[in-house]
A protein has these predicted regions:
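Periplasmic/extracellular loop-to-transmembrane helix junction in inner-membrane transport proteins
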Residues: 1-7, 11, 33-76, 96-97, ...
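Cytoplasmic-entry segments and transmembrane alpha-helices of multi-pass inner-membrane transporters
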Residues: 10, 83-122, 285
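C-terminal transmembrane helix and the adjacent membrane-cytosol boundary/short C-terminal tail
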Residues: 161-165, 169, 176, 203, ...
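Loop-to-helix entry region at the N-terminal start of transmembrane alpha-helices
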Residues: 59-73, 131-155
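Transmembrane alpha-helices
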Residues: 159-160, 182-218
Length: 285
């Protein structure tokens, strides 16, 4: 009976694994089957490096959206990673038990807040603040980066804290025994030891930021042109897809799917690059 249960569970696990792989494969197949022909029709250089997006004139250049996605994601990482890192260090090494539970619950709650709620927060509070402080409309690259920096905090904090807690306590105690201060022991010994977990958390944060749509649409200005400055509006690749997919037909629709292909490849390259970097650093150590 036990042997039968073991075999049954193996089959269940195998089916679940195959279903997951099949789902990813079908998504990739749909994207590439519909997107690659569109890129071929438009022309790879015109599509990837074109600076004008006017579907009514058969102009499908997504270079401004690619740059906007990089700018917004980069800004979010600059805002979110330092805050998340210091928060993780505080929770793992400094936080009193009475504070830890509500703080942990609050961060987990942040992860479950819908994107549209963050978008309303940015639209009602951040955009007017930027407009009154720096001028302009307020909907801008700055607003999108700040908002995404807040949104990726729980995505980075959780894995980073776990990575810090997984480091052997002997590293910390050995550093203290050699005369290092508590802060130096954490930032010079503990953080490098947890580097692989921290890099994984940053990758998750980048994926979260670059794939975000609704919140970005609400605060970024949604302007399909080359980003002109920190206080100017822009449109990311995800925003471009969501904004126009509802009414797009023909080559226009295919070009939007092709934008999804570019976004998919973009995230894949980031993940592979950081994984390779992490592997090289581990081999060096």
């Amino acid at each position: 009976m036990n042997r039968f249960k073991e075999q049954a569970m193996k089959i269940v696990f195998m089916v679940a694994a195959c279903a997951s792989v099949l789902a990813v494969f079908l998504i990739c197949l749909f994207l590439f089957a519909n997107g690659i022909p569109a890129i071929a029709k438009i022309g790879p250089l015109k599509f990837l490096l074109g600076t004008v997006w006017k579907p009514s004139n058969d102009k499908f250049g997504i270079f401004p959206m690619i740059i906007a996605s990089i700018y917004v994601t980069g800004g979010a990482i600059l805002v979110g990673v330092p805050i998340a890192l210091f928060t993780s260090v505080f929770m793992a090494r400094y936080c009193p038990k009475k504070i830890y539970r509500p703080l942990k619950s609050g961060i987990e709650l942040m992860a479950g807040v819908p994107s549209i709620v963050y978008g309303f927060f940015g639209l009602v509070l951040m955009v007017p603040l930027i407009r009154n402080t720096f001028g302009g409309t307020g909907t801008s690259w700055l607003a999108a980066s700040l908002l995404l920096g807040i949104m990726i905090l729980p995505t980075i904090i959780g894995p980073t804290e776990s990575a810090l807690r997984s480091v052997s306590e002997s590293y910390y105690e050995g550093s203290l025994a050699l005369g290092a201060t508590k802060e130096r022991s954490i930032f010079v010994v503990m953080l490098p030891a947890a580097k692989s977990g921290i890099l994984a958390a940053v990758v998750l944060g980048i994926g979260r930021a670059i794939s975000e749509t609704m919140a970005v649409i609400m605060v970024a200005g949604n302007q399909a042109r080359m980003p002109a400055g920190l206080l100017k509006g822009l449109r990311t690749m995800t925003a471009n897809i969501v904004t126009e997919m509802g009414y797009a037909t023909g080559l226009h629709r295919e070009a939007l799917i092709a934008t999804g292909v570019v976004l998919f490849v973009f995230i894949l390259i980031i993940n592979l690059s950081l994984s390779l970097l992490n592997r090289r650093s581990e081999n060096a150590n």
